[in-house]
Amino acid sequence: DRRQRQMCIRDSVVTTQPAGPKRRMGVVAAVATLGSLLFGYDTGVISGALPFMYLPHGAGGLALTVGHEGAIGGTLTLGAAFGGLIGGMMSDRWGRRHNLLILAVLFVVGALGTAGAPSVWVMYPFRVVLGFAVGAASATVPVYLSETSPKRMRGRIVALDQFMIVFGQLLAFSVNAAISAAHGGPSLMVTADPTGRLSPGTYSWDTLQAMTTSHGGAMTDQAFHAFLTQLSVSAGSGGAWRWMLVVCTLPAIALWIGMRKMPESARWHLSHGQLRETVACLKQVRVEGVDEPIVDEVTEMVELNGEGGRLSHRQQWAVVMESRWTRRLLLVGIFLAVVNQTTGVNTVMYYAPKVLELSLIHI
């Protein structure tokens, strides 16, 4: 039976043509990890956009309250939780490549929806969509990279996923800084103040915030929001936040275009009994004489897939927990994920300017 299987695999390797033009793994990884870059950008961009969103509608802002501020961050996290849970099932059913194509569309829809939102209530559902794409990408990109890359470079390729997430956050902060500088920071032009506190003129957001108790003034946050609402405002730089949020449509479009040229995961094809498609995809990304022979790689995949297919979901978990080294890997991975979240890193990513202000560090 084993010999027959190997003969069938050899025959498929000899007779099957590549699924398309040769693709270097570096190019495949660069395209796929645009999903990771979008993950980082979309989680980091909101921190720089919030100061402009605080401004009144007349200044181009959304007149955010403290509750709105928390909900904007929370809706993305809510969507990401669902995306993380469902994204893996989607990629198992439809394929890693196909899933990334869908997520690229969701990234574009979410970015355009949030950037064009006329009110915070319209923004919320699009933040959930964006969060879903973020969560599903985090569950799909590493799997696609690990299943597509050869053994000799698998560690480096998968590590690129984490690098691109952090690079996406850095890109978000850099874009925010550039757009904020181009607009001169958050400001508004007051034409009239019924309370008489302000004379007509242009005021920076920092100047106005000095009136609140958290900045040494006399107004509570609620009173300050009511004060802003009653001002007559003719213009302002609040619209800058829309540019910050819409920028991520560019890598999302690049992801959609690029993934159309990339091969599907060979392991996904094999898990669906598609041997020739498996070989065709491997031929597209393997270098003959450098990587492991395709016959050996497919044989190993078939054997592993056969062993896994004979076990129920509960039995597969039992195999993982019975083995000391796999159990240790699982527990260490869970521990690192929990520690990473309990550091409060997400708070800084979403609300960096607010955290710095409350720390009495003015930026």
Name these PLM-found stretches.
Residues 2-9, 363:
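Short, small-residue-biased leader/transition segments that mark boundaries at the very start
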Residues 10-361:
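Transmembrane-helix signature of 12-pass secondary carriers
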